[in-house]
UniProtKB/Swiss-Prot annotation:
It comes from the Bacteria. The gene is rplV. This is Large ribosomal subunit protein uL22. This protein binds specifically to 23S rRNA; its binding is stimulated by other ribosomal proteins, e.g. L4, L17, and L20. It is important during the early stages of 50S assembly. It makes multiple contacts with different domains of the 23S rRNA in the assembled 50S subunit and ribosome. One of its GO terms (cellular component) is cytosolic large ribosomal subunit. Gene3D superfamilies: Ribosomal protein L22/L17. The lineage of its organism: Bacteria, Pseudomonadati, Pseudomonadota, Alphaproteobacteria, Magnetococcales. The keyword Ribonucleoprotein applies. The keyword RNA-binding applies. SUPFAM superfamilies: Ribosomal protein L22 (SSF54843). Keywords: Ribonucleoprotein, Ribosomal protein, RNA-binding, rRNA-binding. Transmembrane segments: none annotated. It comes from Magnetococcus marinus (strain ATCC BAA-1437 / JCM 17883 / MC-1).
Amino acid sequence: MQEARATTKYQRVSPYKVRLVIDQIRGMQVESAMNLLAFSKKRVAGVVRQTLKSAVANAEENLGLDVDTLVVSQAYVDQGPSMKRFKPRARGRATRILKRTSHITVAVCPQVD
C-alpha cells in the first residue's frame, strides 16, 4: 500500500500536548481532520495541520494519489531533545526546568474499501 508521510522536528511544545491533538485525527478522512484542526483551540493544532498538509502534498506530488480518498493512517509524536533551564527559588536555591521538544509524524494513504 502506498503511503506518504511528513515529519516536523524540534517543535517547541511538549509531546503530551501534541498527543492530545494527534489522537483525535488518527484514522480520519483528511478533509475532516483538516476541519477539526482548523477550528481547534489548541495552539499546537496549527503545527499538526501544517504537517498534515505537507503529507497530503507529498502524496499528491510524489505518488500521484487522489486527495479526496486519503485517510490519516499514522499519526504519532516522539520526544525530541529537552533544553535545560533554571528557575530561581526561595533561599538562594534553583530548580531545573525542562523545555521539551517534539517530533511530529503524520502519514496518509488511500482509503481501502
